[in-house]
């Protein structure tokens, strides 16, 4: 069986499983409608990153229970690596063990929507203080990830964003301006490289997670604003292929050879402990940079626009949010908790703790954001009406396979010169087009 056949079979199997689970969720398990309830009593909340986020959630819950003394929140921490399977298991067992409220990321939102596990929250948002207060690009990402054009199935709370990190001390020593255009980026990569002195202008990700960062660099340089052109992906558009060629040409010319196998942890460690001028990652590594380099030696900016005066083009990052589960017997109380957690004060508190971009625009002027310039710049770019966000198809059952393990070895071949950028893009595009066609067929 060839890889294309295996992938088609795997996608069909995944879709069949979702349809079967949907049928289960629509049976006599109590997950069809649930109840509004009295707006008081006990509700259950599943934290989708239990452990690292437990402390901040307990602070928010304490404040919520102070405001609503007739509501008690039962907090259940779920490890981030187990959360999707935990939801699936609860649905398959009948839905009664699902929480009232759960943390839901866009990477697996479509899976929950397909199984009928979540209530739409569009009308609830419109009838609440959240109306018009959530960053539009995050709302659009959640809507796209759910696989339905008109409904939101979670309230966005935070997002990450691709960031170009650079060593301000090395740039100052070389009398180079900030890499806020692609011309300045490539010039700095060249001028900061001294292989004999083990100094490099850039470090890239060639190991696990490599394709996600390549997509960031491709669409930011090409300026293409949509992942789809009709039913076909734009991934192998000639402008994206040209951008990928420029990106991979950096390998070993201005980057360490070890980049071939670097995952994010190795790449970030290499940047923080060596003489490397630039790194493309996301806001999540800011704490490490500051801890190891010092705040005065590091800066982070959004990836530059494709050309001077053009709008910035950003590839969507997974958006975290809160979902209202359909089986809840106390939706009124559950919604009070969601609205409270997404309010400006609580949303700011949560995102300050995790170092992410708050979804509520009311948090934009808080002191902690002003004191974290990379986060402030990311928030401003995401909230800029001119910014174009390329919505990745998280709703495709085979998206993770295609964009990760199935094609990461191929990306390494491109870096090594064993495969052309065009051949790589065409291969991935063919697989995505087939997955999209299969998904549309089952949408009926």
Name each model-derived stretch.
Residues 378-431:
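C-terminal capping/gating helix-and-loop segments adjacent to ligand/active sites or protein-protein/ligand interfaces
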Residues 106-161, 214, 299-301, 371:
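Hinge/lid segment of periplasmic solute-binding proteins
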Residues 174, 245, 249-255, 266, ...:
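Extracytoplasmic/periplasmic substrate-recognition and gating elements
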Residues 1-44, 66, 127, 430-444:
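Short, low-complexity disordered leader/linker segments with a strong preference
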Residues 98-100, 130-169, 310-314, 389-397:
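A structural signal for short loop-to-beta-strand junctions that line the ligand-binding cleft
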Residues 144-157, 162, 186-233, 276:
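Extracytoplasmic/periplasmic solute-binding protein
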Residues 189-191, 232-260:
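Glycine-centered hinge/linker elements that transmit conformational signals in sensory
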Residues 62-137, 173-180, 270, 274-278, ...:
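Extracytoplasmic "Venus flytrap"/periplasmic binding protein-like
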